Protein backbone atom coordinates (compact mmCIF):
# COMPACT_ATOMS: atom_id res chain seq x y z
CA UNK A 1 0.00 0.00 0.00
CA UNK A 2 1.12 3.53 -0.72
CA UNK A 3 0.05 6.64 1.15
CA UNK A 4 1.11 10.18 0.24
CA UNK A 5 0.19 13.52 1.82
CA UNK A 6 1.61 16.76 0.48
CA UNK A 7 1.21 20.47 1.07
CA UNK A 8 3.29 23.26 -0.46
CA UNK A 9 2.79 26.96 0.25
CA UNK A 10 3.77 28.76 -2.93
CA UNK A 11 5.70 32.03 -2.75
CA UNK A 12 7.65 33.52 -5.62
CA UNK A 13 10.80 34.23 -3.61
CA UNK A 14 12.20 34.08 -0.10
CA UNK A 15 14.05 37.32 -0.78
CA UNK A 16 12.69 40.86 -0.60
CA UNK A 17 9.76 40.92 -3.05
CA UNK A 18 10.08 44.70 -3.37
CA UNK A 19 13.27 44.14 -5.37
CA UNK A 20 11.27 42.32 -8.06
CA UNK A 21 8.94 43.82 -10.62
CA UNK A 22 5.30 42.78 -10.60
CA UNK A 23 5.85 41.37 -14.07
CA UNK A 24 8.69 39.08 -12.93
CA UNK A 25 6.64 37.83 -9.95
CA UNK A 26 3.65 37.17 -12.22
CA UNK A 27 5.92 35.33 -14.65
CA UNK A 28 7.05 33.00 -11.85
CA UNK A 29 3.42 32.19 -11.01
CA UNK A 30 2.65 31.52 -14.70
CA UNK A 31 5.57 29.09 -14.79
CA UNK A 32 4.27 27.38 -11.64
CA UNK A 33 0.82 27.01 -13.18
CA UNK A 34 2.33 25.47 -16.33
CA UNK A 35 4.37 23.00 -14.26
CA UNK A 36 1.28 21.87 -12.36
CA UNK A 37 -0.92 21.64 -15.47
CA UNK A 38 1.65 19.52 -17.31
CA UNK A 39 2.31 17.18 -14.36
CA UNK A 40 -0.39 14.65 -15.24
CA UNK A 41 -1.35 14.35 -11.58
CA UNK A 42 -4.41 15.06 -9.46
CA UNK A 43 -2.93 18.02 -7.58
CA UNK A 44 -5.08 20.77 -6.11
CA UNK A 45 -3.95 24.39 -6.48
CA UNK A 46 -5.89 26.71 -4.18
CA UNK A 47 -5.88 30.31 -3.04
CA UNK A 48 -6.85 31.18 0.51
CA UNK A 49 -6.44 34.47 2.35
CA UNK A 50 -3.99 35.77 -0.25
CA UNK A 51 -1.85 32.64 -0.21
CA UNK A 52 -1.41 30.07 -2.95
CA UNK A 53 -0.89 26.46 -1.97
CA UNK A 54 -0.69 23.06 -3.57
CA UNK A 55 -2.01 19.87 -2.00
CA UNK A 56 -1.71 16.21 -2.90
CA UNK A 57 -3.38 13.14 -1.47
CA UNK A 58 -2.73 9.70 -2.90
CA UNK A 59 -3.72 6.27 -1.70
CA UNK A 60 -2.87 3.35 -3.99
CA UNK A 61 -2.33 -0.39 -3.78
CA UNK A 62 1.06 -0.06 -5.48
CA UNK A 63 3.49 2.69 -6.40
CA UNK A 64 2.86 4.14 -9.83
CA UNK A 65 4.41 6.85 -11.97
CA UNK A 66 1.95 9.32 -10.41
CA UNK A 67 3.84 9.14 -7.10
CA UNK A 68 7.09 10.16 -8.76
CA UNK A 69 5.30 12.82 -10.82
CA UNK A 70 3.91 14.42 -7.65
CA UNK A 71 7.34 14.53 -6.01
CA UNK A 72 8.95 15.90 -9.19
CA UNK A 73 6.21 18.52 -9.55
CA UNK A 74 6.79 19.72 -5.98
CA UNK A 75 10.53 19.90 -6.70
CA UNK A 76 9.99 21.88 -9.91
CA UNK A 77 7.59 24.32 -8.27
CA UNK A 78 9.98 24.80 -5.35
CA UNK A 79 12.91 25.51 -7.69
CA UNK A 80 10.84 27.95 -9.76
CA UNK A 81 9.16 29.77 -6.86
CA UNK A 82 12.03 29.65 -4.37
CA UNK A 83 10.03 31.12 -1.50
CA UNK A 84 7.80 28.04 -1.50
CA UNK A 85 7.92 25.69 1.45
CA UNK A 86 6.18 22.50 2.40
CA UNK A 87 6.32 18.78 2.92
CA UNK A 88 5.41 15.43 1.43
CA UNK A 89 4.87 12.48 3.74
CA UNK A 90 5.18 9.14 1.91
CA UNK A 91 4.64 5.59 3.09
CA UNK A 92 5.29 2.75 0.65
CA UNK A 93 5.24 -0.71 2.22
CA UNK A 94 6.68 -2.25 -0.98
CA UNK A 95 9.79 -0.06 -0.91
CA UNK A 96 12.61 -2.50 -0.09
CA UNK A 97 14.58 0.15 1.79
CA UNK A 98 11.81 2.17 3.48
CA UNK A 99 9.01 -0.42 3.78
CA UNK A 100 8.46 0.14 7.52
CA UNK A 101 8.79 3.89 7.69
CA UNK A 102 7.44 7.16 6.43
CA UNK A 103 9.69 9.18 4.19
CA UNK A 104 9.65 12.97 4.38
CA UNK A 105 10.40 15.30 1.50
CA UNK A 106 11.01 18.81 2.83
CA UNK A 107 10.86 21.73 0.40
CA UNK A 108 12.37 25.13 1.26
CA UNK A 109 14.38 27.83 -0.53
CA UNK A 110 14.28 25.92 -3.82
CA UNK A 111 15.72 22.74 -2.34
CA UNK A 112 14.33 19.31 -1.51
CA UNK A 113 15.62 17.38 1.49
CA UNK A 114 14.75 13.68 1.82
CA UNK A 115 14.65 12.25 5.36
CA UNK A 116 13.24 9.33 7.28
CA UNK A 117 10.45 10.19 9.70
CA UNK A 118 11.07 9.53 13.39
CA UNK A 119 7.57 10.34 14.69
CA UNK A 120 5.54 7.53 13.09
CA UNK A 121 8.45 5.30 12.14
CA UNK A 122 9.16 2.49 12.42
CA UNK A 123 5.50 1.99 11.48
CA UNK A 124 5.55 -1.39 13.23
CA UNK A 125 5.35 -1.13 16.24
CA UNK A 126 4.90 2.69 16.46
CA UNK A 127 1.49 2.94 14.75
CA UNK A 128 0.63 -0.72 14.03
CA UNK A 129 1.08 -4.05 15.74
CA UNK A 130 3.08 -6.81 14.10
CA UNK A 131 0.12 -9.09 13.40
CA UNK A 132 2.16 -11.43 11.19
CA UNK A 133 5.06 -11.93 13.60
CA UNK A 134 7.60 -10.60 11.14
Task: Go through each PLM region and give its residues.
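Residues in well-ordered beta-strands of folded domains
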Residues: 7, 57, 89
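Short, intrinsically disordered low-complexity segments
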Residues: 30-75, 79-81
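Ampiphathic alpha-helical segments that act as solvent-exposed interaction surfaces
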Residues: 25, 73-85, 122-134
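Short C-terminal domain-edge/linker segments immediately following a structured domain
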Residues: 38, 85-90, 118-122
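Amphipathic protein-protein interaction modules
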Residues: 61-107
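Acidic, proline/glycine-rich low-complexity IDRs
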Residues: 96-134
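Generic "edge-of-domain/loop-turn" microfeature
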Residues: 13-15, 63, 95, 112
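Short, extreme N-terminal segment that most often corresponds to the first beta-strand
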Residues: 1-29
Amino acid sequence: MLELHGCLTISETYKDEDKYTNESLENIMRQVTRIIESSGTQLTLRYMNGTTFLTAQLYANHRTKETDNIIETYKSVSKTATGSYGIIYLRDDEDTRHYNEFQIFIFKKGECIHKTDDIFSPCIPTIEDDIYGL
